[in-house]
Amino acid sequence: MKIKPMAMIAALLWAAVPMANASVQVGFSPEGSARGLVLDTIHHARHTIDMMAYSFQSADIVQALVDAEKRGVVVRAVIDKKRNQGKVSQKAIAFATANGIDIRLDDHYHLQHDKTMIIDGDTLETGSFNFAKSAEFANSENVLVIRGEPGVVAQYQAHFDSRWNIAHQHD
């Protein structure tokens, strides 16, 4: 099926237009808009960030989380245990935990493959974007940020809470 250029443009413009009380933003990598959207979403957090991550390696994203923690935002993360045993991940985990971020490791599944943040109980960031340098600069990835959809955010919060409760505290 061939998509007409005008239909594509209309779809892209519609994706960032607020709908009633809801708004949706999208970003892609390696073009840079995915990374920028993730960082911007973290930057605007006021109270809480609950993150689920397969890869926890990206220095700029970890720094943004630490900066949020220093602003008084409570940051919690559930990350895949097996994926994050290498030096880069261990350095990121050590830096994050030394700066107040509460990290739990999940090894209950073949992969803890979620890539999601719930921010302030009203914003959801999700997509294929791993929190790793390869997602920023090498892979074809996507990010979706939804605001003003409390039912959707509540479902993701329940999913996060279930993973948080079964994951192990990082030593």
Stretches found by the model and what they are:
Residues 1-8:
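Bacterial N-terminal signal peptides that target proteins for export
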Residues 25-27, 50-52, 76-79, 104-105, ...:
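Structural recognition of the beta-strand scaffold that forms the well-ordered cores
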Residues 55-59, 81-85, 109-111, 123-124, ...:
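Solvent-exposed loop/turn segments at secondary-structure junctions
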